[in-house]
Amino acid sequence: MTVEKIEAQLTNLEMQLTFQEDTIDSLNKLVTEQTQQMSEMQKQIRWLGKRLKQMQENQSTDSDPADEPPPPHY
């Protein structure tokens, strides 16, 4: 191999490395953002689960439908 070919290969490898480093940085930022989004969604799901449970408990503690007077058409 000539010196020129070795230098060209080295330059090519350096460019590939730079591109890969940039890609890794971009992917790392994306993973970080998605992790934050997932954490927020998990909080929202927990809140919704608690709210649903409260609503179900409130419904079950309401008066018995048999205790209510019949509708006016009876």
UniProtKB/Swiss-Prot annotation:
InterPro entries: SlyX. It comes from the Bacteria. Residues 52-74 are annotated as: Disordered. Pfam families: SlyX. Belongs to the SlyX family. This is Protein SlyX homolog.
